[in-house]
Curated annotation (Swiss-Prot):
Keywords: Calcium, Disulfide bond, Fibrinogenolytic toxin, Fibrinolytic toxin, Glycoprotein, Hemostasis impairing toxin, Hydrolase, Magnesium, Metal-binding, Metalloprotease, Plasminogen activation, Platelet aggregation inhibiting toxin, Protease, Secreted, Toxin, Zinc. GO terms for biological process: proteolysis; regulation of blood coagulation. It comes from Macrovipera lebetinus (Levantine viper). Negative results: has no hemorrhagic activity. Has no activity toward factor X (F10), prothrombin (F2) and protein C (PROC). Its cofactor is Zn(2+). The lineage of its organism: Eukaryota, Metazoa, Chordata, Craniata, Vertebrata. It is an enzyme of class 3 (hydrolase). Ca(2+) binds at residues 9, 93, 197, 200. InterPro entries: MetalloPept_cat_dom_sf, Peptidase_M12B, Reprolysin_adamalysin. The active site is at residue 143. It catalyses: Hydrolysis of 14-Ala-|-Leu-15 in insulin B chain and 413-Lys-|-Leu-414 in alpha-chain of fibrinogen. SUPFAM superfamilies: Metalloproteases ('zincins'), catalytic domain. Expressed by the venom gland. This is Snake venom metalloproteinase fibrolase.
Length: 202
């Protein structure tokens, strides 16, 4: 194995816009979120990164932060909320906000680079932008990739197919593989930062 195993305990928050999109059908939302995680698990197999879904929170009664089109602002507020609120009641390593708000500049996701395990910065936001689960999962896997030190792929990066996970553009014909560049960047991140929270097996 090129990579030692790592274990990410994930919390996914579905905001009020997602609750509304699914007509407040929490069962449907949970099913969708479980499918997302199952897809993310597949994408990360090559990196020996294992995911468990620690919790799903659905903001049925209204958002607990001010979710807004400016993605950087929403991401910052979500990180602050995680540190202040979520971490105090739920052990986890990383939190992702699933939303259905029209984000500025056609953004479908945003995350902090190298944020994994940091109380505020181990977060991402992902738009529920497709009826194809794998497409949304690819975006969430991409944002978690940023948290794990991966940058966008340049033209020289290769994953043996179209559209690697860290490609700047999401394509229908995605290969859902991490490129050689991503693997090198992930390895460098582990070496330089060795984020402690993902060492323990849940």
């Amino acid at each position: 194995e090129r990579f030692a195993p790592r274990y990410i305990e994930l919390v996914i928050v579905a905001d009020h816009s997602v609750a509304t999109k699914y007509n407040d059908n929490v069962t449907a939302i949970l099913s969708w979120v479980h499918q997302l995680v199952n897809n993310i698990i597949l994408f990360y197999r090559d990196l020996n990164v294992h995911f468990t879904l620690s919790a799903v929170e659905v903001w049925s009664n209204g958002d607990l932060i001010n979710v807004q089109p400016e993605a950087t602002v929403t991401l910052n507020l979500f990180g602050e909320w995680r540190e202040r609120d979520l971490l105090n009641r739920r052990m986890h390593d990383n939190a992702q906000l699933l939303n259905n708000v029209a984000l500025d500049d056609n953004t479908i996701g945003l995350a902090y680079d190298e944020g994994m395990c940091d109380p505020k910065y181990s977060v991402g936001i992902v738009k529920d932008h497709s009826a194809i689960n794998r497409m949304v999962a690819a975006t969430m896997a991409h944002e978690i990739g940023h948290n794990l030190g991966m940058n966008h792929d340049g033209s020289q990066c290769n994953c043996g197919g179209n559209g690697c996970v860290m490609s700047a553009v999401l394509m229908q014909q995605h290969s859902y593989q991490f490129s050689d560049c991503s693997k090198d960047e992930y390895q460098r991140y582990l070496t330089n930062h060795n984020p402690q929270c993902i060492l323990n097996q849940p």
